[in-house]
A protein has these predicted regions:
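N-terminal "first-domain core" detector
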Residues: 1-60
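Beta-strand-rich solenoidal segments
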Residues: 4-8, 61-254
Length: 254
């Protein structure tokens, strides 16, 4: 194993190989850190809706093993439509140049919620004529509202081995769970974990927390839909026990 670090001192010539080392170490570190993560949102990319424009903040996305760095905000105009609109990120690779390979990404709105092989979803919304699109939420249950709100439950968020919830969803959950009466030790521990990790929590931890409360969903492993539904019930009813039945519903659009 060998690692080379350029010595940036006066009167020394900076060779092109040294420049490559500087380039590769900075990017290679991120590649190693996120090597076990699925495709999806890694950092940032906060979405705001204002005056008919969606603004996607700076951040990092992973797609097909490559990490895309967004160093500038992106803007996408929107307007009401008779149905769901999906904000998608689309990725392409350009190898036409002999000097470099270009990894490109763009954001756009699509009336089709299905995804092509080179796309991922950032959020979706159903904006009615005469209504205002919201990007903030009254409470955790409000995040599953169908109309006139940025819906994050379907967002592609990178996780270890499987996708996870958008950090905004879990931070709202911890905010409400943290002030709930009759909290158990596991509830407090989960809140601290969410706060310390800024909402970046793996799905396995949420399932374990729910199972510790005696909440199950039959014999199948709980997916994001079921986990969200059970979390909402905990906030609505307090610390519930017993088994969870599939007959209960939540607004969760695939």
């Amino acid at each position: 194993m060998e690692n080379r670090y350029p010595l940036l001192a006066g009167r020394r010539i900076l060779r092109k190989e040294s420049l490559w080392d500087i380039r590769d170490y900075a990017y290679g570190g991120w590649q190693l850190y996120y090597m076990d993560y699925t495709d999806g949102l890694l950092k940032g990319c906060a979405i705001k809706a204002q005056s008919g424009v969606l603004t996607i903040g700076k951040g990092m996305l992973k797609f097909h093993g490559f990490i895309y760095l967004m160093q500038e905000e992106e803007r996408v105009p929107y307007r009401p439509a008779d149905g769901w609109q999906s904000l998608k990120a689309e990725f392409t690779e350009d190898e036409s140049s002999l000097d470099d390979k270009v990894y490109q990404g763009r954001f756009f709105l699509d009336n089709e919620t299905g995804l092509k092989e080179n796309q991922m979803e950032m959020c979706r919304f159903y904006l009615r004529e005469g209504s205002v699109l919201r990007d903030s939420y009254k409470d955790f249950a409000d995040m599953a509202t169908e109309y006139d709100m940025l819906y994050l439950c379907n967002a592609a968020v990178a996780g270890i081995g499987e996708g996870r919830f958008h950090p905004g969803i879990l931070k709202q959950f911890a905010k409400e769970l943290g002030v709930q009466k009759g909290k158990e030790g596991a509830d407090i521990a989960l809140c601290y974990e969410i706060w310390n990790r800024d909402g970046e929590i793996q799905m396995a931890l949420l399932r374990a927390w729910l199972e510790g409360k005696g909440i199950s969903w039959g014999t199948d492993r709980m997916g994001k839909e079921e986990v969200f539904c059970c979390m909402e019930e905990v906030l609505r009813k307090g610390n519930v026990g017993g088994s969870r039945k599939r007959s209960e519903k939540v607004i969760y659009v695939e």
